[in-house]
């Protein structure tokens, strides 16, 4: 009888550890090592029944390469590495009012283009 209690306890502990690990994994958004492609995704915070709000999400490319010597000579502060990247941004959008008086952009089309947050 004591043997079965130990066996049951081990099974329950193993099951609880497995469920804890399973529960701690993300909900499938970024489970792959690679980032998903740039596309529209519903914004669950601003969306309401019958009036979904979409935003562009995903990854585009970025790369770094050695700066050509002739380009380094023209720089005020020469840098050995030049980087280039694009971000997932809205190609087209409409203005929408949510929660009474908050104006947001409801993205309708996405593409990879200049990263706007770098332009401040």
Curated annotation (Swiss-Prot):
Disulfide bonds join 35-59, 38-88, 56-110, 60-112, 87-115. Residues 1-24 form the signal peptide. The keyword Disulfide bond applies. It comes from the Eukaryota. One of its GO terms (biological process) is regulation of signaling receptor activity. Glycans are attached at residues 80, 106. GO terms for cellular component: extracellular space; follicle-stimulating hormone complex. Keywords: Disulfide bond, Glycoprotein, Hormone, Secreted, Signal. Belongs to the glycoprotein hormones subunit alpha family. PANTHER family: GLYCOPROTEIN HORMONE ALPHA CHAIN, GLYCOPROTEIN HORMONES ALPHA CHAIN. Heterodimer. The active hormones thyrotropin, lutropin, follitropin and choriogonadotropin are heterodimers composed of CGA, a common alpha chain described here and a unique beta chain which confers their biological specificity to the hormones: TSHB for thyrotropin, LHB for lutropin, FSHB for follitropin and choriogonadotropin subunit beta/CGB for choriogonadotropin. Shared alpha chain of the active heterodimeric glycoprotein hormones thyrotropin/thyroid stimulating hormone/TSH, lutropin/luteinizing hormone/LH, follitropin/follicle stimulating hormone/FSH and choriogonadotropin/CG. These hormones bind specific receptors on target cells that in turn activate downstream signaling pathways. This is Glycoprotein hormones alpha chain. It comes from Callithrix jacchus (White-tufted-ear marmoset).
